[in-house]
């Protein structure tokens, strides 16, 4: 039975954290290391944590520099074979750890990624699609999406990836995942259909309240990749967007500039597609204008041309009307 280390970063989530803790401990997994890093909560969080302290490997309540910093504190203490973090407003499905232990076989499996129930007002509104994996590394990097709560890493991989970037507060998991892809490619990844986690969307959740910040950090992340690895596309970011380099960016050795260049064009295509879906034709057209279609695979080039034509010939009001009819 492999040792599983779970970290819960917490700050003022007293209304949810007991269910989070219970979902970890009630797994009845004998080789568990559970760490809670609280950022100095002023609500009843600490009182709840103390109720369970004899079952915890370690806990602390002290001021920190945000979620990434809290997770890093836990990572430095973690000694398990398998690692993940669970936010203090989410909770695991029963038997998750048992399944994870089984899925991390054989030993060359470095990542196991399942799916999440998305909850609103304690009701399941949808089930996540899971990790984005494509048939090309550049597309997987450009469209990088990780269902973090349901994605577990082997500690051996994390030792090479390093800690989370503490300057990131919204897409630290995405940057971490890109680091994995740059180090290991598409190798060692096992994607499964199991639902591992219940992920809450509520008024105070980051996912619900800070969408613009997610987009801003994503632009800064891909710009930093372009700039620090000396990819020519960095100049396009500088020309068209208000961006800045991410502090404490970790540059990995021996990374192909050609791979990164193609990945950036996939990032622009992905952002263009999202902007179009949100009826932001101006932003969609800007992202598409940056793309060299020669860097895209055939089916993705078809999407590129389709988006350009729809932006040109299908005005937003007509698009909305068609969607209503459907």
Predicted regions and their residues:
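Short, acidic, metal-binding catalytic loop of nucleotide-sugar glycosyltransferases
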Residues: 22-31
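Short aromatic/hydrophobic "clamp" motif used to bind/position activated sugar donors
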Residues: 83
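Glycine-rich, basic loop-to-helix element that forms the pyrophosphate-binding segment
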Residues: 62-78
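Conserved donor NDP-sugar-binding/catalytic core segment of glycosyltransferases
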Residues: 91, 95-126
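Membrane-interface aromatic/basic loop that binds lipid-linked glycans or pyrophosphate carriers
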Residues: 227-229, 243-326
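Conserved nucleotide-sugar donor-binding catalytic segment
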Residues: 129-224, 229, 233
């Amino acid at each position: 039975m492999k040792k599983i280390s779970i970290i819960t970063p917490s700050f003022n989530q007293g209304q949810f954290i007991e269910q989070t803790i219970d979902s970890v401990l009630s797994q009845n997994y004998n080789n568990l290391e559970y760490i809670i890093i609280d950022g100095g909560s002023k609500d009843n969080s600490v009182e709840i944590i103390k109720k369970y302290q004899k079952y915890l490997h370690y806990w602390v309540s002290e001021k920190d520099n945000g979620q990434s910093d809290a997770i890093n504190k836990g990572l430095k203490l973690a000694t398990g074979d398998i690692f993940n973090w669970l936010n203090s407003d989410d909770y695991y499905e029963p038997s998750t750890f048992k399944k994870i232990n089984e899925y991390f076989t054989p030993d060359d499996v470095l990542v196991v990624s399942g799916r999440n129930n998305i909850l609103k007002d304690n009701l399941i509104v949808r089930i996540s699609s899971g990790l984005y994996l494509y048939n090309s590394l550049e597309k997987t990097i450009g469209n990088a999406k990780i269902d973090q709560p349901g994605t577990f890493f082997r500690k051996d991989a994390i030792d090479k990836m390093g800690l989370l970037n503490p300057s990131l507060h919204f897409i630290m998991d995405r940057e971490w995942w890109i680091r994995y892809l740059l180090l290991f490619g598409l190798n060692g990844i096992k994607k499964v259909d199991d639902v591992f986690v219940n992920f809450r969307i509520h008024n105070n959740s980051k996912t619900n309240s800070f969408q613009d910040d997610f987009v801003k950090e994503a632009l800064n992340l891909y710009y930093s990749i372009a700039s620090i690895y000396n990819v020519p596309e960095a100049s396009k970011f500088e020309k068209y967007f208000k961006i800045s380099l991410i502090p404490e960016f970790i540059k990995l050795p021996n990374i192909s500039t050609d791979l990164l260049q193609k990945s950036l064009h996939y990032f622009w295509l992905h952002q263009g597609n999202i902007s179009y879906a949100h009826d932001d034709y101006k932003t969609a057209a800007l992202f598409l204008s940056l793309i060299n279609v020669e860097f895209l695979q055939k089916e993705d080039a078809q999407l590129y041309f389709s988006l350009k034509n729809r932006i040109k010939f299908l005005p937003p009001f007509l698009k909305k009307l068609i969607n209503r009819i459907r």
